[in-house]
């Protein structure tokens, strides 16, 4: 099923084109309804992207992709790229480091810290656990 469409105020076009990763609740039409964790196609002027909807947070939308609908392989690519980017840290004799930096690694709201053989995963958006369904 295609994601729902959401038309946002045109004044958001410039900040979103500049790479701002969030849309705040105040900027979302009040009548919009979806379950948390739903991928939404957003538009603001000529800007278009796929974003993750959070029905509870003041950060209502986290922009995930301006090119394609995120999928399992899309998420795996972001995780792999973050792993490769941290190769210098991994090659040193450290036993703890941050693997995923959320928005900085293209996975808004997801932070992963490694401590030895253990990973601590923090999800900062309601419904983000649904990412596993992609």
Whereabouts are the PLM-identified features?
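RNA-binding accessory domains that recognize and position tRNA/RNA substrates
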Residues: 1-134
């Amino acid at each position: 099923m295609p994601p729902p469409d959401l038309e946002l105020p045109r004044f958001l076009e410039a900040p979103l084109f500049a790479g701002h990763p969030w849309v705040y609740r105040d900027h979302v039409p009040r009548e919009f309804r979806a379950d948390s964790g739903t991928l939404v196609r957003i538009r603001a002027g000529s800007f278009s992207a796929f974003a993750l909807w959070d029905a509870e947070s003041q950060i209502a939308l986290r922009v995930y992709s301006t090119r394609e609908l995120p999928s399992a392989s899309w998420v795996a690519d972001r995780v792999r790229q973050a792993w490769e980017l941290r190769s210098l840290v991994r090659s040193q004799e450290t036993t703890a480091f941050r693997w995923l930096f959320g928005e900085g690694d293209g996975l808004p709201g997801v932070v992963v810290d490694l401590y030895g053989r253990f990973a601590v995963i923090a999800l900062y958006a309601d419904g983000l656990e649904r990412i596993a369904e992609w």
